[in-house]
Regions:
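ASCE RecA-like P-loop NTPase motor cores
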Residues: 1-56
């Protein structure tokens, strides 16, 4: 997870407590919330469930 966090930061994403705008990401345990700049809604990656979930 640390490698992914470092990579996202290098790509210009900003770590925050709450993902509210494009370019934000947040980490809580094995869950990564990410708002890609080219998407209308953020996504959630649950590394324990091994699935990608869009959320609004």
């Amino acid at each position: 997870m640390e490698v992914l966090i470092e990579r996202l930061s290098k790509l210009g994403y900003l770590r925050s407590d709450l993902v509210e705008k494009r370019g934000d990401f947040a980490v809580r345990g094995g869950i990564l919330d990410l708002f890609p700049p080219d998407q209308e809604h953020p996504i959630r990656i649950d590394f324990f469930a091994k699935k990608l979930t869009p959320f609004k």
